[in-house]
């Protein structure tokens, strides 16, 4: 009986893991270059961790159950609550705290391109500072990771501020901005008519509803933020966002846009919110995050401002493939072929020597013909074949074949490592 993979979950074959490894290693390397340190936490948490402040929509998407001890638990749907739980459980950690993680997360939602019920998610958070410097640093980190993945110039970062949105909406006479937030969060999923009708259904005038629609319709240059307040005084939240963008310019972060439709659905965000998008518009948000200054208070008596973001592997993987970005190979790969009655011990010795010198080495273990071995080596993506035949080995030599050109040369075992190291075919 053939048992199929569960809907919304993925298998990762070796070629898939190449790009996953590239994403993991690039994100980790860039994060550590900013002074971030890696953490990890359980895949299973008490459901109460998410009941506190994540919102009803997220709770409805959890893989939750009652365990054999009668405890209500869930596979983690996101990383931030677990990260905050870890931080608040200890009081000896100096601020600012720069942490990153790369867990698997689970949400029961409808699978689509770039969205699965299980995925890896890179997360980075800064705890302690409540200022624009931290806001700019976390966005700069996000941009640095995308650049490191070979996506420089292919994306734009869109920013907003929930507090500034409140200021603008209050200026329109809207008493309950959070009701509007939930509608704005669905802006890209509904028609104009539905969007305007939804706003009017919660008490907004038709004029204000259409104004909000226009504000959401197009990302603008940051210089236009002041104009959102008309002839009125620009709010402190707007000044803060402008200041954050100014710092980002000094970080060298380009293509930053202001976007009123960026709200971020999670209810714990308190100020800055941001997302990164592929400029072609082919994919949903690449990453997203913001400031959540009040979350730590919900788990403890500690007041710890925080800002962070999350980046799922699924959309990034699709984007890299669409742009033709391939994972780089840091080491040359070699296949050691065994010909005739050459003993396995000789193959093991040659393989060990090459591995000790930093090469990726696969060796023949199936006693196939040389042509079959070479065909397999090419299939595996090896760059060279080291052919160990009886006659060559009697002279303490092997034949090295460049699998991309077919050229080959007899090389002594003593010269094998430097010969491969100086080869320019890679």
From Swiss-Prot:
GO CC, alphabetical: cytoplasm
CDD domains per record: HisRS-like_core (cd00773), HisRS_anticodon (cd00859)
UniProt-listed SUPFAM superfamilies: Class II aaRS ABD-related, Class II aaRS and biotin synthetases
Keyword Ligase: yes
Molecular functions per Gene Ontology: ATP binding; histidine-tRNA ligase activity
InterPro entries hit by this protein: aa-tRNA-synth_II (IPR006195), aa-tRNA-synth_II/BPL/LPL (IPR045864), Anticodon-bd (IPR004154), Anticodon-bd_dom_sf (IPR036621), His-tRNA-ligase (IPR015807), HisRS-like_core (IPR041715), HisRS/HisZ (IPR004516), HisRS_anticodon (IPR033656)
Compartment(s) where it occurs, according to its Swiss-Prot or TrEMBL record: Cytoplasm
UniProt main location, coarse: cytoplasm
UniProt-listed Gene3D superfamilies: Anticodon-binding domain, Bira Bifunctional Protein, Domain 2
UniProt record, GO biological process: histidyl-tRNA aminoacylation
A Pfam cross-reference name: tRNA-synt_His
Enzyme Commission identifier(s): 6.1.1.21
Keyword Transcription regulation assigned: no
Keywords linked to the UniProt accession: Aminoacyl-tRNA synthetase, ATP-binding, Cytoplasm, Ligase, Nucleotide-binding, Protein biosynthesis
Recorded catalytic activity of this chain's protein: tRNA(His) + L-histidine + ATP = L-histidyl-tRNA(His) + AMP + diphosphate + H(+)
Family: Belongs to the class-II aminoacyl-tRNA synthetase family.
Name of the molecule in the record: Histidine--tRNA ligase
Species this protein is from: Thermoplasma volcanium (strain ATCC 51530 / DSM 4299 / JCM 9571 / NBRC 15438 / GSS1)
